[in-house]
């Protein structure tokens, strides 16, 4: 039986600032060009869900704080503060301010919340740190913060919020893994972090990346702007993904002599983009944009060090009119996603992205009409699940929690299945936000995945 939101009570203790366990350098570190995006206060929050440990004598809050303190010796910039420099760019002041850490106690068992597998956003928001002190215009939130919530069953959640310009998903995962290794008894993390931001400094350019659409050509939805935005989590099982890919191959074989393979990301990205556009009832002649993050660590020349934990992403982009998106064979749209992803991996594209952000980060903004842009992020392969074990059991689930980065109607995240639902092995969870009035149509589109004829 689902737990009633009105009955959920969370008692919070005093906030503490966890500092490195040993002295660390006191310096100001500049960020890379890829971290100069025009959203320096965007936070990347996730909730890790753990069942009751077999050794009930261990206090997870104590263990996590001790391990965090040790990890910050290696990741000491994360114990500092983001500040704006005189040149307008953001840097990290390594002032040993510490990482905000909040311990809380919930009045229910995790099983009553279905281990967050239903992903009630109202609950998830209560499990991450909501720390917004008064700041002047030249200062930003802490690079990272934690909230550990204990439940009556002995299980607990770890809410980790990370500044999106300091760490991308891969970087945040490396940091979390270091904490886990130290919590489980290791004397040091296996992978030593490196700063290496100087590898990603660009040249001033007068030819920024072209804008794929502007506000005069962007599609519009009759449902936007909206005050009532919903967040839903859709489960796409392995069989539905197989049927989708088979149907795409069938389309190609009917129209081309040469077959082509598509990844799960490429196939689902195209399908979800089209489904969302239909749900929003975008106007036919307006343009709609799919933009997705592309991780380029191994595509640099030479590749970035394994210990690099900063932001190292470019963005793939596909733009079509709503009429084209709605009427083209889905396989054609998937090909465009694949081609855009491959372009984003190239050295020329990476350099142009870096140069544009170095010259004028504001040029990187994408103009959009209400609902015209879908921002897609793939979290399936970050490495948070399932081998993140504090010496107890591995996490049973990991979910995003909305904040200033997520509270708009143009977001979609692909997630790995939770360990709570064995039937979803090999599947994908699709997290999306839409106006409430558009969600029924999107649900209908997602249900259609189950009956696609290969």
Swiss-Prot record:
Biotech use: Disrupting the production of quinolizidine type antinutritional alkaloids (QAs) by selecting inactive tetrahydroanabasine acetyltransferase variants is a potential kick-start for the domestication of novel legume crops.
InterPro entries: CAT-like_dom_sf (IPR023213), Plant_acyltransferase (IPR050898)
Quaternary structure and interacting proteins, as annotated: Monomer.
UniProt similarity note: Belongs to the plant acyltransferase family.
Name listed for the protein in its UniProt record: Inactive tetrahydroanabasine acetyltransferase pauper allele
Protein source organism: Lupinus albus (White lupine)
């Amino acid at each position: 039986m689902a737990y009633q939101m009105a009955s959920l009570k969370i008692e919070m203790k005093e906030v503490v600032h966890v500092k490195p366990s040993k002295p660390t350098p006191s310096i100001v570190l500049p960020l890379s060009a890829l971290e100069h995006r025009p959203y320096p206060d965007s936070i990347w929050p996730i909730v890790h869900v753990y069942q009751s440990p077999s050794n009930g004598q261990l206090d997870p809050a104590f263990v996590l704080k001790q391990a965090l303190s040790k990890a910050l010796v290696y990741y000491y910039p994360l114990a500092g503060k983001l500040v704006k420099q005189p040149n307008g760019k953001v840097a990290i002041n390594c002032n040993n301010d510490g990482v905000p850490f909040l311990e809380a106690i919930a009045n229910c068992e995790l099983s009553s919340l279905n281990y967050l597998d239903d992903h009630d956003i109202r609950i998830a928001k209560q499990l991450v740190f909501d720390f917004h002190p008064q700041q002047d215009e030249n200062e930003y939130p802490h690079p990272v913060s934690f909230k550990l919530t204990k439940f009556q069953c002995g299980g607990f959640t770890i809410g980790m919020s990370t500044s999106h310009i300091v760490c991308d998903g891969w970087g945040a995962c490396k940091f979390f893994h270091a904490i886990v290794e130290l919590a489980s008894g290791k004397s040091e993390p296996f992978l030593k972090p490196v700063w290496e931001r100087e590898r990603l400094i660009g040249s001033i350019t007068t030819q920024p990346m072209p804008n794929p659409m502007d506000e005069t050509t962007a599609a519009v939805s009759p449902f936007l702007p909206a005050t009532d935005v919903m967040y839903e989590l859709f489960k796409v099982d392995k069989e539905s993904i197989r049927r989708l890919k088979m149907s795409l191959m069938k389309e190609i074989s009917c129209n081309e002599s040469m077959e082509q393979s598509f990844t799960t990301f490429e196939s689902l990205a195209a399908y979800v983009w089209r489904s969302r556009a239909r749900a929003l009832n975008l106007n036919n002649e307006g343009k709609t944009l799919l933009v997705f993050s592309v991780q380029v660590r191994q595509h640099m020349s030479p590749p970035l060090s394994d210990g690099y934990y900063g932001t190292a992403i470019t963005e793939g982009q596909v733009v079509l009119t709503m009429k084209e998106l709605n009427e083209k064979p889905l396989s054609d749209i998937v090909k465009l996603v694949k081609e855009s992803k491959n372009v984003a991996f190239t050295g020329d594209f990476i350099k142009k992205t870096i140069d544009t952000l170095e010259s004028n980060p504001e040029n990187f903004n994408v103009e959009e009409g209400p609902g015209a842009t879908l921002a897609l992020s793939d979290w399936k392969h970050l490495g948070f699940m399932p081998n993140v074990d504090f010496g107890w059991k591995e996490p049973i689930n990991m979910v995003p929690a909305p904040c200033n980065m997520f509270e708009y109607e143009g977001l979609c995240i692909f997630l790995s299945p939770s360990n709570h639902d064995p039937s979803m092995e090999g599947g994908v969870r699709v997290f999306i936000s839409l106006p409430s009035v558009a969600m029924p149509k999107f649900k209908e589109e997602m249900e259609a995945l189950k009956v696609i004829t290969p």
